[in-house]
Amino acid sequence: MTPTGTPRVCEVSILPIALSCLFSSSAARTKGAKRLGTGPAPSDCIRDHHAVKATVSSPDGPRYGRPSFHFGPPTALFNKSLAILKHDLEHLENFTPTEEHMVPALQLVASATAFFEKEDQRRNELEKILPAFLGQGVKWRTPIAGGSAKPNGILLEGSFACLIFELKNEPGLEGDPFLQSLIVYDKIISHEVSFRSPPVHGPAAKLPLQYSGFITQSNFPVVLLTMAGNYLVVSTAVYTDAVYADKLLSIDLHLGSHGPANVLRLARVFMAIRNCTDTLSGYYRRLEPGSRPSVMYPSLTADPPEDQTKIPQLEYIAKVDRASGIPLSIVDEDDECHGIYLAKRTCSSTDDTPAEVVLVKFTSTYGQSAHRLLAEQDPPLAPALYSCNRVIGGLYMVVMEYLPDASPLHRFFPPSPVPYSLKADVIREALKKALELLHARDHVFGDLREPNVLYSHEGDRVFLVDFDWVGKHQESRYSPCLNPDANLGVKAWQVMEKVHDEANLQRLMTWLTGE
């Protein structure tokens, strides 16, 4: 309810649409998984520039930041084990290695810094050392996924990969081991009958496992460990609406003046990795075939983890279109990049989030105080803000009111107009008031554009949204990644000023009225 007593969210009208989107997305995800492994062998995908470009630029290519628009939400948002690994790697001082860790750590540094004439010789040396960190269950050069992939090393729980290890003799020779490990991961996901490694309890251990039976039950979290000479990289990956991967840590292994500290750090890194693979093993042991569409959506861990009770318990319904806020049945390339969802509070939630459908946004920065200021006006000038908490992945989880009857201004014009007219005077006065309130507290909104102004024909209401860029007058700066096509009249990294908001209000009204 609004402060004036009028309902804003019609749960009955939005849920059938959103649920339809959920099951359509799940079906699309299953079909997409079958396409993942249809490309060349992993080693062929990285053999030269053209192969790499074709692999990562394809519609089903992995999202890890190349090209620049091929990225998505952090993998830590989707699995607690991966989130804890990221947190642990950022807080290595919490680990206290024993002699059992330090001896192989020194051996690994010495081996990594040595030169080998052939890659096989380097691999043979590492096969003797890595089990001390990863356990004896690692399979070396074992064909998997029907023989379509043969990783240097793989740690399996049943048929599921907990860790994939790829190696190159030296950096720059024979391709990128990180990308190769991602293609191996693609092959594993897409393969209909997955390799199952005994022992598994009971006679089922000898039966082929239909991987498709789990495609709607898991987002298949995995650790990717890669080495090229003395360069080691720790990464993670998941499969939701696409394959997403993050490089968490890169280390140049060497001794020198800081040898003891470098060896200690490496031992701690592998302690964190082992903790993660152990918990992933437990996760995969508990999996059963079935359907759980929530695997496409975040499963969050608070930052720090001990603040977990602050995270609202939500049931995610659909990803939404960034430009319109409409639930998506098919997630296209543009919408793969963001983390904006519809959700509903679960019955077990103990926070103040209301029971109706809410909008959940993940962002690296957020102007929480500015949002609350406008949301608490009567009538409100922004959607109600229910919570704003840090989660592992370096993001804020922002939970706010969802306004299905309000649309961004550009939606009232062709090519897909909303069948209602706008009242320019109402919009002008509401935005002037919003800016006056913000500027009185030295806030600069910083992103006053058509998509960030919602208009509802019910009561002629106007709402500002997207407080990611809010900054302090003459102190904060615009993003260094500012898109010049945003038409904000400012430059990247320019100092933020109130006059910029005022100029953009004038520009917006000129666009709206043609005057």
Question: Each PLM stretch: what is its role?
Answer:
Residues T2-K128, F270, N275-D278, G282, ...:
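Charged, often low-complexity linker/regulatory segments
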Residues I154-I164, K344-E356, G459-R461:
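Active-site beta-strand-loop-beta-strand hairpin of nuclease catalytic cores
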Residues T363, R372-R428:
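Conserved structural core of kinase catalytic domains
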Residues H457-E515:
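C-lobe/activation-segment region of protein kinase-like
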Residues I317-P380:
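ATP-binding glycine-rich loop module of kinase domains
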Residues L77-I215:
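A short, conserved, highly charged catalytic patch centered on acidic carboxylates
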Residues H439-S456, L464:
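Catalytic-loop of the protein kinase fold
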Residues A261-I330:
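Juxta-kinase regulatory segment immediately upstream of eukaryotic protein kinase catalytic domains
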